[in-house]
């Protein structure tokens, strides 16, 4: 699948942007406890999902409303799975899971119920780790390289993350994928609780 990188977070950028294993150079996270890290180094969102949200909210959201580092034109017809990769110029990214919404997103949107809306919408964007650093710029072609079809989709991981009684086999299958550490820890904890109840 091929799509187009359409914008870069926060401001219009002329020229090339450097991406390292820590993310975009010059683009830091304010809350490093819950955001960022090498397996959540670059957060992708799509213009297609922005268009959907504009229809739901009846107004046009400004760029980077969801805190993404890079905005793609589309994620394509098939949901992104954990382990799928994105080649953007010389940069190679690997999907590690969804953005888990928090109160900061609700504050940004001016809607105390927006976290619930975001979860129900199942359009969480995609956290990625940087497998190959390099430079990119607006307008680059994006090539999606599909990973294992056994891996969970990113929306499925978000559902498992918030589920009160997730199916243990779904958790086990998700944990076989290259998840971000914070998400992996949460799902491992859920599975441990289930296993304790069956001992």
Give the residues covered by each predicted segment:
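A mid-sequence, solvent-exposed acidic-amphipathic segment
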Residues: 112-130
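Short loop/turn positions at the edges of beta-strands in beta-sheet-rich folds
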Residues: 74-76, 122, 132
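Acidic, Mg2+-coordinating catalytic module of metal-dependent nucleases/exonucleases
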Residues: 143
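Short, flexible micro-motifs
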Residues: 26-29, 128, 137
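Electropositive, beta-rich accessory/interaction domains or terminal extensions
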Residues: 1-106, 113-114, 146-199
